């Protein structure tokens, strides 16, 4: 099976609260992978202990596991994985799509997004707060922007589709509606049916496939 890959490069918006440490100092390396964010921000690693390795991340070298219901995988390099990006207004992630892969309807609550197609064809769209759909087939060299917080999706329509994506935020967040709000949850099928216009049999099937309970 030919693997289709998209590489997402995510650049973060330099809000003052997020970049305070980097504004005062040359940089702020979070104190280790998985460092916890606090109301006052991340704790910076002692600069005397910072090395070049803190500004290098190799976690995107390996393709993500696309053996799942959406035939896709996202491998992030946000501050939780890449401590060196804190306060710099830049981060990245990798997206791998297998044949038939799709990134379902989702939103980045804290980030706008830019997608650049390198090869292949991608169908991309977002929905405005006025419920207007902006949809476009993207070809190599095309760039599409997705406003912050709006629902959007990407679907592979060609055989291969590497691309670049930028997200304007330090830790852009990702909420995939089907995964986080409906089907994997403990909400009973009847409740979800009343809010999605899907029949209960379909909902039970989706919940089962996404690890939810009926």
UniProtKB/Swiss-Prot annotation:
GO terms for molecular function: manganese ion binding. Mn(2+) binds at residues 106, 108, 113. One of its GO terms (cellular component) is apoplast. Oligomer (believed to be a pentamer but probably hexamer). Residues 58-204 form the Cupin type-1 domain. Cotyledons and leaves. PANTHER family: GERMIN-LIKE PROTEIN SUBFAMILY 3 MEMBER 3 (PTHR31238). Keywords: Apoplast, Disulfide bond, Manganese, Metal-binding, Secreted, Signal. Induction: Expressed with a circadian rhythm, with peak expression 10 hours from the beginning of the night. The gene is GLP. It is found in: Secreted, Extracellular space, Apoplast. Belongs to the germin family. Disulfide bonds join 28-44. This is Germin-like protein. It comes from Ipomoea nil (Japanese morning glory). Residues 1-22 form the signal peptide. The keyword Secreted applies. CDD domains: cupin_OxOx. SUPFAM superfamilies: RmlC-like cupins (SSF51182).
């Amino acid at each position: 099976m030919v693997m289709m890959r998209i590489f997402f490069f995510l650049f973060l918006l330099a809000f003052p609260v997020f970049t305070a440490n980097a504004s005062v100092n040359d940089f702020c390396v979070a104190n280790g992978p998985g460092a916890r964010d606090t109301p006052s921000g991340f704790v910076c690693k002692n600069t005397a202990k910072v090395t070049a390795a803190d500004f290098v991340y190799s976690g995107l070298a390996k393709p993500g596991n696309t053996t799942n219901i959406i035939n896709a995988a996202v491998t992030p390099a946000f501050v939780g994985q890449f401590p060196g990006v804190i306060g710099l207004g830049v981060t990245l992630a990798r997206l791998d799509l297998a044949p038939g892969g799709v990134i379902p309807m989702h939103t980045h609550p804290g980030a706008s997004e830019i997608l650049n197609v390198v090869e292949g064809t991608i169908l991309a769209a977002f929905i405005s707060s006025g419920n207007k759909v902006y949809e476009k087939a993207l070809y190599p060299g095309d760039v599409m922007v997705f406003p912050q917080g709006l629902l959007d999706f990407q679907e592979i329509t060609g055989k291969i589709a590497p691309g670049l994506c930028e997200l304007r935020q330090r830790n852009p967040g990702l909420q995939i509606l089907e995964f986080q709000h409906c089907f994997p949850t403990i909400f009973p099928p009847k409740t979800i049916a009343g809010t999605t216009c899907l029949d209960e049999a379909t909902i039970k099937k989706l919940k089962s496939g996404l690890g939810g309970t009926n």
